[in-house]
Amino acid sequence: MPDQTQQFSFKVLTINIHKGFTAFNRRFILPELRDAVRTVSADIVCLQEVMGAHEVHPLHVENWPDTSHYEFLADTMWSDFAYGRNAVYPEGHHGNAVLSRYPIEHYENRDVSVDGAEKRGVLYCRIVPPMTGKAIHVMCVHLGLREAHRQAQLAMLAEWVNELPDGEPVLVAGDFNDWRQKANHPLKVQAGLDEIFTRAHGRPARTFPVQFPLLRLDRIYVKNASASAPTALPLRTWRHLSDHAPLSAEIHL
């Protein structure tokens, strides 16, 4: 009998949206950013630095949405979304968000902050596409600015990945702030995660600063999955929308 098993693929996008403002907070561009994100037609979107709420900005920022920023971005294109609050301040809070065309059956936000005021988190979502009925484990990541903090956070991330069911696909994407390129080795050795740009091109993609990318800060890792068409999206479209270049890829299960 012929093999009835069919490969399932989906498109992922990750981007640090800088709370919906241009560099140095000169201009609010969330509506333009939503339009750009929609053109990618990603099935799963991992967002960092998403404004969850703010009491002051709506009073003086033109085009400030009535909903949370992640709901505004999801709009009618992504039926499911999840938000993990990381940084909290008197006026509001921001964190990571995941938008999905497929049902998010469970999500939780884990605090990976290490000493001091720098608040960081990993947003986990268990996503189950109806056409497969099988779980995809997605983690949206924003790690710290200090190397020692990042190493501790990478260890926490690896431990969490290892707690997931054996053989099930894992996607880890986001802003790793890993300008010294020290994340790939521990994540591969400790958790079996492969960075897809490194697998395809020998090293992670340059993503920061978006005007002239030099640093390789943003990543897409997979486990129990393969990837194709890893792409740092064209700067001419995105350079005024974020300080990071977005990354996208096709993931195959």
UniProtKB/Swiss-Prot annotation:
> Which Gene Ontology CC terms are recorded?
membrane
Q: One MF term from GO for this chain?
A: catalytic activity
Q: Which InterPro entries match?
A: Endo/exonu/phosph_ase_sf, Endo/exonuclease/phosphatase, GPI-anchor_lipid_remodeler
Extract one GO BP annotation from the record.
GPI anchor biosynthetic process
Gene3D superfamilies according to UniProt: Endonuclease/exonuclease/phosphatase (3.60.10.10)
Q: Which Pfam families match?
A: Exo_endo_phos
Q: What is this protein called?
A: Uncharacterized protein YbhP
